[in-house]
């Protein structure tokens, strides 16, 4: 952990206390803290990039995967975008103290449901130092403390970022203890046991990593274990659109969890579509795999059962020919990870059937699955993507980091007056 003699439970307790102070600050005070962070990150950009270059060099020397190295790299443009994201979060509406219910139960007895912070977030992530910036800004805006654990491959970048963030917060109303960084793998095990201090764990990383977190804590976990996304090219697709959407969905950022891993193609247009899309993908250095029907039309290696279950996070794409919309939906609902699925079709009814029947957090029509992102949704940023059925679902921004409490105000009201033979009636009138 970063230069402290405190034990992890003591750090978590301090973060809990700091989060309670943060929760009662005004929106203006929280926004001032975000602006201070943005200014400090800008002023110290060279230090951040220098630390990141050292991390990337070490990762390459250790022969870590190209996908991980791509996530790890914090280019000047990436850092600039992350800083802009901090300011975008500050511009968002205040998620706290929103009145969701304002109801008269009886004269003088008023029930209100008010949004409030969750408390303390434990966020564990691999690579992606820009995620630390996003998460911190969302935590502060939503009034939550946050304990961060980055991957060892990003340790220099994360330490530089948190040091700068602490310096910025020390000049604001936000206690720097609201943002803490852990640096050793052993601390993950201990963090997962701190259910008395941590309200939500958010893991970001490989499917094995996320499943490990889910299986080793009593703390609620928000996240997704897999990003196996599909694109279905319908028999009534505009093929030029289909090619552009396929190429973007696979190559725009192959390491992202919303990148397509399997392309499903209707048999009626496969012979016309596959050679054209294969050429476009191969120009982008994508390795293609195909089922037997696909291999009769284009020269590619065989796709196996394992391929339909694999999140490549790389320039690899499996292709399968299907005989109907129903077959495509069946394949997706069996192999998909409930993340993001897409269809290309000019038939509105076909697209609606697909959207209604596919089980996923996001279902897209005639656009790239890469749009599944909190920033692109207008959330300012995201702490992660959730594929679980219980909310929040999909990209999780500010709304997913707040809960609510019921506040009931009366004037000597007691339940005994509302029970028995002469019970008073409730008015239950929304105000």
Curated annotation (Swiss-Prot):
<dbReference type="GO" id="GO:0055129">
    <property type="term" value="P:L-proline biosynthetic process"/>
</dbReference>
<dbReference type="InterPro" id="IPR016162">
    <property type="entry name" value="Ald_DH_N"/>
</dbReference>
<keyword id="KW-0641">Proline biosynthesis</keyword>
<dbReference type="InterPro" id="IPR016161">
    <property type="entry name" value="Ald_DH/histidinol_DH"/>
</dbReference>
<comment type="function">
    <text>Catalyzes the NADPH-dependent reduction of L-glutamate 5-phosphate into L-glutamate 5-semialdehyde and phosphate. The product spontaneously undergoes cyclization to form 1-pyrroline-5-carboxylate.</text>
</comment>
<dbReference type="GO" id="GO:0050661">
    <property type="term" value="F:NADP binding"/>
</dbReference>
<dbReference type="InterPro" id="IPR012134">
    <property type="entry name" value="Glu-5-SA_DH"/>
</dbReference>
<dbReference type="GO" id="GO:0005737">
    <property type="term" value="C:cytoplasm"/>
</dbReference>
<protein>
    <recommendedName>
        <fullName>Gamma-glutamyl phosphate reductase</fullName>
        <ecNumber>1.2.1.41</ecNumber>
    </recommendedName>
</protein>
<keyword id="KW-0560">Oxidoreductase</keyword>
<keyword id="KW-0028">Amino-acid biosynthesis</keyword>
<keyword id="KW-0963">Cytoplasm</keyword>
<keyword id="KW-0521">NADP</keyword>
<comment type="pathway">
    <text>Amino-acid biosynthesis; L-proline biosynthesis; L-glutamate 5-semialdehyde from L-glutamate: step 2/2.</text>
</comment>
<dbReference type="InterPro" id="IPR016163">
    <property type="entry name" value="Ald_DH_C"/>
</dbReference>
<dbReference type="InterPro" id="IPR020593">
    <property type="entry name" value="G-glutamylP_reductase_CS"/>
</dbReference>
<dbReference type="InterPro" id="IPR015590">
    <property type="entry name" value="Aldehyde_DH_dom"/>
</dbReference>
<dbReference type="GO" id="GO:0004350">
    <property type="term" value="F:glutamate-5-semialdehyde dehydrogenase activity"/>
</dbReference>
<dbReference type="InterPro" id="IPR000965">
    <property type="entry name" value="GPR_dom"/>
</dbReference>
<dbReference type="Pfam" id="PF00171">
    <property type="entry name" value="Aldedh"/>
</dbReference>
<comment type="similarity">
    <text>Belongs to the gamma-glutamyl phosphate reductase family.</text>
</comment>
């Amino acid at each position: 952990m970063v230069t402290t003699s405190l034990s992890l439970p003591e750090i978590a307790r301090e973060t809990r206390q700091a989060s309670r102070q943060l929760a009662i600050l005004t929106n203006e005070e929280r926004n001032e803290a975000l602006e201070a962070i943005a200014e400090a990150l800008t002023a110290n950009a060279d230090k951040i990039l220098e630390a990141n270059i050292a991390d990337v060099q070490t990762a390459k020397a250790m022969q870590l995967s190209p996908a991980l190295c791509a996530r790890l790299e914090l280019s000047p443009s990436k850092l600039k975008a992350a800083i802009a994201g901090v300011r975008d979060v500050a511009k968002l509406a205040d998620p706290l103290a929103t009145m969701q219910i304002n109801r008269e139960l009886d004269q003088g007895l008023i029930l209100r449901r008010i949004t409030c912070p969750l408390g303390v977030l434990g966020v564990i992530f691999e690579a992606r130092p820009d995620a630390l910036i996003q998460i911190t800004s969302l935590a502060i805006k939503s009034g939550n403390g946050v304990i961060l654990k980055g991957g060892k491959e990003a340790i220099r970048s994360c330490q530089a970022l948190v040091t700068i963030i602490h310096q910025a917060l020390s000049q604001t109303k936000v206690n720097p203890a609201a943002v803490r960084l852990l640096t050793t793998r052993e601390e993950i095990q201990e963090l997962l046991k701190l259910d008395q201090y941590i309200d939500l764990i958010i893991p970001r990383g490989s499917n094995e990593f996320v499943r490990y977190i889910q299986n080793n804590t009593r703390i609620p976990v928000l996240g997704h274990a897999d990003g196996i996304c599909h694109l279905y090219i319908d028999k009534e697709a505009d093929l030029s659109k289909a090619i552009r959407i396929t190429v973007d969905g696979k190559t725009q950022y192959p390491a992202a969890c919303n990148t397509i891993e399997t392309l499903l193609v209707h048999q009626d247009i496969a012979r016309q579509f596959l050679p054209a899309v294969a050429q476009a993908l191969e120009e982008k250095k994508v390795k293609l795999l195909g089922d037997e029907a696909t291999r009769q039309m284009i020269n590619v290696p065989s796709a196996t059962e394992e391929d339909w279950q694999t999140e490549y996070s790389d320039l690899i794409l499996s292709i399968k020919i299907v005989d109907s919309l129903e077959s495509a939906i069946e394949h997706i609902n069996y192999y998909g990870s409930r993340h993001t699925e897409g269809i290309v079709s000019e038939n509105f009814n076909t697209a609606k059937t697909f959207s209604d029947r596919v089980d996923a957090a996001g279902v897209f029509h005639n656009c790239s699955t890469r749009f599944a992102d909190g920033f692109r949704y207008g959330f300012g940023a995201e702490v992660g993507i959730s594929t679980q059925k219980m909310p929040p679902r999909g990209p999780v921004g500010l709304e997913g980091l707040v809960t609510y409490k019921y506040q009931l105000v009366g004037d000597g009201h007691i339940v005994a007056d509302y029970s028995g033979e002469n019970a008073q009636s409730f008015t239950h009138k929304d105000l």
